[in-house]
């Protein structure tokens, strides 16, 4: 039971630190957590936690690239304001390219990956503000393009 409480305390401290939007590296997060008494924390643990909670790097008010948590910690839905983060959707003969607001690509890609092959998505690769999406077997690029436009209520 003691271990669970320690883990919960770590998660609470981790989320609180990310809400400050001032940590630009995993090393800085490790150091801050160690200063809070989590002596056994290391960079690989912080990396796993960032992934687990869907943290993204984005610009803060001072225009510094920092880690932060998305507004929703669960799998995002298209009824949330996420569609406002999609700026442009285009395609060629092989892939669909989605341009997002800075820092939003990984969040949008996570949503698309959660839809999966049945919706025509084989997989995504996300950077900071760009996503490459490839269609699943049996789906044409144009079909995937139209489906993504409809999903984010973009105009043709």
Swiss-Prot record:
One of its GO terms (biological process) is regulation of arginine biosynthetic process. One of its GO terms (molecular function) is DNA binding. Keywords: Amino-acid biosynthesis, Arginine biosynthesis, Cytoplasm, DNA-binding, Repressor, Transcription, Transcription regulation. It holds the Pfam family Arg_repressor_C. Pathway: Amino-acid biosynthesis; L-arginine biosynthesis [regulation]. It comes from the Bacteria. One of its GO terms (cellular component) is cytoplasm. The keyword Phosphoprotein does not apply. It is found in: Cytoplasm. The keyword Transcription regulation applies. Gene3D superfamilies: 3.30.1360.40, Winged helix-like DNA-binding domain superfamily/Winged helix DNA-binding domain. Its main location: cytoplasm. Belongs to the ArgR family. Regulates arginine biosynthesis genes. PANTHER family: ARGININE REPRESSOR (PTHR34471:SF1). This is Arginine repressor.
């Amino acid at each position: 039971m003691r271990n669970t409480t320690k883990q919960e305390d770590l998660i609470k401290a981790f989320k609180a630190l990310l809400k400050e939007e001032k940590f630009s590296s995993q090393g800085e997060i490790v150091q801050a957590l160690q200063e809070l008494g989590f002596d056994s924390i290391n960079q690989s643990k912080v990396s796993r936690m960032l992934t687990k909670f869907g943290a993204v790097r984005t610009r803060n008010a001072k225009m510094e690239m920092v880690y932060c948590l998305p507004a929703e910690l669960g799998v995002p839905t298209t009824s949330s304001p996420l569609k406002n983060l999609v700026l442009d959707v285009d395609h060629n003969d092989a892939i669909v390219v989605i341009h997002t607001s800075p820092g939003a690509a990984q969040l949008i890609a996570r949503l698309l990956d959660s839809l999966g092959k049945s919706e025509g998505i084989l997989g995504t690769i996300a950077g900071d503000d760009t996503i490459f999406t490839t269609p699943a077997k049996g789906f044409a690029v144009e079909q995937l393009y139209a489906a993504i436009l409809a999903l984010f209520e973009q105009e043709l």
